[in-house]
Structure formats: C-alpha cells, structure tokens
From Swiss-Prot:
Involved in the gluconeogenesis. Catalyzes the conversion of oxaloacetate (OAA) to phosphoenolpyruvate (PEP) through direct phosphoryl transfer between the nucleoside triphosphate and OAA. Pathway: Carbohydrate biosynthesis; gluconeogenesis. NCBIfam families: pckA, PRK09344.1-2, PRK09344.1-3, PRK09344.1-4. It catalyses: oxaloacetate + ATP = phosphoenolpyruvate + ADP + CO2. It is found in: Cytoplasm. Its cofactor is Mn(2+). Its main location: cytoplasm. The keyword NAD does not apply. This is Phosphoenolpyruvate carboxykinase (ATP). Its EC number is 4.1.1.49. Mn(2+) binds at K201, H220, D257. It comes from Rhizobium etli (strain ATCC 51251 / DSM 11541 / JCM 21823 / NBRC 15573 / CFN 42). The gene is pckA. The keyword Cytoplasm applies.
Length: 536
C-alpha cells in the first residue's frame, strides 16, 4: 500500500482491516484535496474558488437506513423506539464486506476531533473513498495541530464508501444504503450514499451516546456569547431560525449546530459550519454568503450557471443545498469554540397555526416540557394552494441523532438549568394574525428586538401575563415592538377561530407528550398546556 501524508504509524489503516487498499492519503490539505477531487472527476471548481460536488440520488440524510448495533452494552441504554437495532453478527458481515470492497481502492483519511473541550473530546478518524468527502469532514470537525498528528490515536473510526451497496438479506438492513453505528467498539460504516452530512451526524450521534454518562449534556443547537461573556444557546428544528438568529454582529459565534454543556460551560462539537444555501443572498446573510465565494468551501448540490457561478435560487437538484466551511471563515467566530455556562436558553419554534406568542418565559419544568416536545410546524408548498399546517414534534429538537431515551437528556438539561439559574425563553418565528395562509410571518425585526431584550436581561424585568393556553409568561409590552403581536389572539379577526385553533394545537401537544409522562416528574407533567377560557 502506498502511503502519503503525516500520520501515526501505529494506527495505520491496516489496524482496522483496510490493509488491502491500493493507497491512502492521510490528512491532506484543502489544496491537495481540491487537486485530487478535480483530477478524479468528483467535483469542479467554481468561478470564485469554492469546490462544488453533487451527491446523486441521495441529497439528504437517510434516517430509515440508520442502525445501531444492539449488544450487551447498548441493549439497556438505547431508545429502541427511535433507533433501529442491528445484530453484532450482521454488523460483522457488513464490516467484512465493506473492507473487502475497499481492497485496491485509493482512500483518504483525516484525523480530527469532535468536541472543543479537551476532557470530553472524541478523536475521530474518517476514512473516505471520495477526496471531496475528506475535505468536507476536514472543514466540519476540529482540526488538531499538525504536531499532534504523528501521535494521534482515534477513539472513533468512520468508514464511508458510497460505491458499496449493502444487501438487506445478508446485512440485516433495509436497502442498499446503510449507516451502521457500533457504539461499543467506536466504528461507523456508511455505504450506498454520497450525502456528506451522514459523516457529520454520525459523530454527533456517537457524542450524544457517550457524553450523558459523563454528566455532559449534548445539544442540537447554535450558540453565541456577548462581550461580557454572557453565553446563549438556541435550540430549534430546521427552518426555525437557529443559524440566522445566532449570527449576531454584536456577539461572538461559538457554533451553529452541535454543542455540549459540561461542568465548565458550553463547547462546540465542531470546527466548521454546514449551512443551507437555498435562496442565500449577500443582503440577508452576508457572512454565510461570503464563505461561498472563496477557496476551501465545499458547495453540495448547488447548481452552477454557464460561468460556473453558484445559483442559490435554483433548487432543481434539491431544496437541501449546502455549503461546508471551517469556522474561521466567519469573521466573528470564537477561536476556542468554548464559553461559560449559558445565561440564556432560547427554544425556537415556527408555529404555523398562528397560536403562540412571539416570546414567552419558561420555568425549568416548562423548559423541559418544551425540550422533550420539540415542536415546530411545517407548511406545504404554495404551489399546491393553502393547506393545513402540519405539526412536527422532534424530541430534544433532534430526535434522529438521540440514541438514548429523551428523558435522559431532558432531566440533565433541567438539572443544569436549575443549577446555573439559566433564563429560558420560547421564541416563535412562525405566523401571526392567523394561521399559515391567512396570517403573516412574524416580522424578523420584532423577533430580533425581543431576542436582544431577552439576552440583555431587560425583558425579564417587565410586566408579564399568563398565557391562557400554554401557561407560560408573556410580556405585556416591550419597547420598540408592536404591542399587538405579543397577544396572538388579539391579532386574529375571528376570535372563535383562534380559540378553536389553540385548542387543536394544545391537544396535539398533550397527545404527543403521553409517551414521556412515565419518565418525568410531576412538575414537568404539570407544565403541560391546557385551554382555559379566554376573555374577549
């Protein structure tokens, strides 16, 4: 086997059974990986210097093809209602077949780290058959100092071979695509998909398994910190504004997607960002847009025009177009990826039913209730006309990546909130004045104004009312914000229609939470919403 690049000779690919590969390129730089990807026809250079790659059939994650090995260690620790089991025997067959498939191939390996806090970091080796995948994961995870590479010892190994096709009958999986996680032995196998996000989320899944046992809370969130060291965490599902609202020129960005909360404070799991680019503009999101115009950034499934310039308005390949870049491409990003304990937690929702207020203060019990609920609402495409919004509940604001039972994460979060006296707010970036189709989107200016007041501590000192549907505290008036939007019912022309819509959403919350009731204490159960008669 030919070997190129700096690495630890004691942990070469042969140690994981890949000794039959034709060559391996360890820890290649962005420039070298550009050359390899372009030479192999995997990707092309854009006019501005980014690297554009297409993923073919899979333009998003394949959650139905993700499996966790069920063994003596994991059997009692994994939430099997949400995670698909794979037997150790099937995993061993899959591993052996993937290793055999890799024989004679040219491979790439990156030695990286998941987790910016040393005591909780996960040294990770990612082995890929595609050069652009090697650049992608190099951008996304934390890159160790060059001096550390000759002694680097991985605790997690990911092998990603898109050209390998799994056999459901032989490997115990669902299709030719497979993401199989052996949490006990620290090995993840990815086959049959070129979508690069699978690698990133595999590291997240493993950290979500390992950290709670150490008393560390893993979170699917963005985070930033103010000039006085006041950190804030933003939970939220896709499309609720996590990335947009945490990108604040007055605050330092810690990270946009995955963090841990330890005894020392919060820390980023990653060293880069994986931002959506559909309809991205220099006006609306200048910092993210700027990363797409430079060398080193990977553009995934972005359409290029005849001049090789990205067309971010073109969703013909997928709406899930992305860019992957290292954190230092953002001007006000943290150099350490760490901050103290959060002063504020924001839970974002985009309520398309038009029922929730733009902001509400949560008690620790209410915070745990809404964290376990993980509510937002999806809206249908306008080309099909106006249809009912669809409620989405993704527990912990990230169910696909949570191997343990949600109550484990929820109880840990509640304990940390109480211990550190964190102020919690629910922020609704959805609809006001009616449901989706009749109402309008919550003005971003109002959301930013309310958020700034919450982060500064001023909002907590104002007068509040108790919401009759959800029981949380809502400010009565806030300087610089139109007072009418603070009371959603008053923005509806038809008050009876509002009451009916509120009752409908409350009943959805209650039905969804039934599965958690046996796993939480009375305080959290009592934080459930309940419709009370509203005064006209």
């Amino acid at each position: 086997m030919e070997k190129f690049g700096v690495h630890n000779p004691a942990t070469e690919l042969a140690t994981v059974g890949l000794g039959g590969a034709a060559s391996v390129r360890y820890n290649f730089s962005a420039a070298a990986l550009y050359e390899e990807a372009i030479r192999r026809g995997e990707a092309e250079l854009t006019a501005q210097g980014a690297l554009r790659a297409l993923t073919g059939q899979h333009t998003g994650r394949s959650p139905r093809d993700k499996f966790v090995v069920r063994d003596a260690n994991t059997d009692g620790q994994i939430w099997w209602d949400n995670n698909k089991p794979l037997s150790p025997e099937h995993f061993a067959l899959l591993r052996d077949d993937m290793l055999a498939h890799a024989a004679g191939k040219d491979l790439f390996a990156q030695d990286l780290v998941g987790g910016a806090e040393e005591g909780h970091a996960l040294p990770t080796r990612v082995i890929t058959e595609l050069a652009w995948h090697s650049l992608f994961i190099r951008n996304l995870l934390i890159r160790p100092e060059a001096a550390a590479l000759p002694t680097f010892v991985p605790k997690l190994t990911i092998i990603d071979l898109p050209s390998f096709k799994a056999d459901p009958a032989r490997h115990g999986c669902r299709s030719e695509t497979v993401i199989a996680c052996d949490l006990t032995n620290g090995l993840v196998l990815i086959g049959g998909t070129s979508y690069a996000g699978e690698m990133k989320k595999s590291v997240f899944t493993v950290l979500n398994y390992l950290l709670p046992a150490k008393g560390v809370m893993p979170m699917h969130c963005s985070a930033n910190v103010g000039p006085d060291g006041d950190a804030a965490v933003f939970f939220g599902l896709s499309g609720t504004g996590k990335t947009t609202l945490s990108a604040d020129p007055a605050r330092t960005l810690i990270g946009d997607d995955e963090h841990g909360w330890s005894e020392n404070g919060i820390f980023n799991f990653e060293g880069g960002c994986y931002a959506k680019t559909i309809r991205l503009s220099a006006e609306a999101e200048p910092e993210i847009y700027a990363t797409t115009q430079r060398f080193g950034t990977v553009l995934e499934n972005v359409v290029l025009n005849e001049r090789r310039e990205p067309d971010f308005d073109d969703g013909s390949l997928t709406e899930n177009t992305r860019c992957a870049y290292p954190m230092h491409f953002i001007p006000n990003a943290s150099e350490t990826g760490r901050a103290g304990h959060p002063k504020t937690i924001i839970m974002l929702t985009a309520d398309a039913f038009g029922v929730m207020p733009p902001i509400a203060r949560l008690t620790p019990d209410q915070a745990m209730y809404h964290f376990l609920s993980g509510y937002t609402a999806k809206v249908a495409g306008t080309e099909k006309g106006v249809v009912e919004p669809e409620a989405t509940f993704s527990t912990c604001f990230g169910a696909p990546f949570m191997p343990r039972h949600p109550a484990e994460y929820g109880n840990l979060l509640k304990e940390l909130i109480s211990r550190h006296g964190v102020e919690c707010w629910l922020v609704n970036t959805g609809w006001t004045g009616g449901a989706y189709g009749t109402g309008k989107r919550m003005p971003i200016k109002a959301t930013r104004g309310l958020l700034a007041a919450a982060l500064s501590g001023k909002l907590g000192q104002l007068q509040f009312r108790t919401d009759t549907n959800f029981g949380f505290a809502v400010p009565v008036s806030v300087d610089g914000v139109d007072g009418s939007i603070l009371d959603p019912r008053s923005t509806w022309a038809d008050k009876a229609a509002y009451d009916a819509q509120a009752e409908k959403l409350v009943s959805m919350f209650i039905a969804n939470f039934a599965k958690f009731e046996d796993h939480v204490d009375g305080g959290v159960r009592d934080a459930a919403p309940g419709v009370k008669a509203a005064a006209e």
